Amino acid sequence: NPITEHWKKEEIGFDAIYTGYLGSFEQIDIIANLFDDFKTPDNIILVDPVMADNGKLYPAFDEAFAKKMATLCAKADIIVPNITEASFMTGMEYKEVYDEAYIKEMLGKLAELGAKISVLTGVSFKEGTTGVMGYDKENDEYFYYSNEKLNASYHGTGDIFASTCVGALMNGLDWKESLKIAADYTAECIRLTMEDP
């Protein structure tokens, strides 16, 4: 890739690399190569494998795409799929009604893909709440944080969450504090949008 070759020649590096929606196998390959070229012991790679929701893949994607996305997640430090995306990448059955054991099993299977920290978004253990649950493979540590579920759905909330999470990490906060800030900020964005659509 001439762009990444130029970056290398100019000795350009990155404190963080964050990916969201990727539209093709080719784009995943380009990003995978970029990760290989620019990963350092000190930087952070976060992948939001945007491709599915509510038990279904988006129309442009199939199960082969989900498996390909799983190979990209393997190269990340942190991954932030929703439950649907995680079910397609791990082969676990998607459930609308679940318990903590199901979520922990799914996080374990996500961790097996290779990322240091796996996070599931849209996790709810109690009616009227929605939250995130993360798993730190190295320290065998889980973290759950929830907010009141707001009765609205907007495109881009996952992007806000992941972007805020990266921003918090870049400001020196640990992964748990970063998830909390990102969840709170996303909830506040939804709340303000509901007040003034």
Predicted features and spans:
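Conserved N-terminal subdomain of the carbohydrate kinase-like
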Residues: 1-59
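Short beta-strands and strand-loop turn motifs
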Residues: 16-19, 44-54, 80-89, 120, ...
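Glycine-rich beta-alpha junction loops
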Residues: 23, 51-53, 85, 122-126, ...
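Conserved phosphate/ATP/ADP-binding segment of small-molecule kinases
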Residues: 60-141
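SAM-dependent methyltransferases
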Residues: 138-140, 152, 193-197
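Short pre-catalytic strand/loop immediately N-terminal to key active-site residues, enriched for Gly-Thr
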Residues: 141-155
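Short, small-residue alpha-helix embedded
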Residues: 152-175, 179
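Charged C-terminal helix
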Residues: 176-197
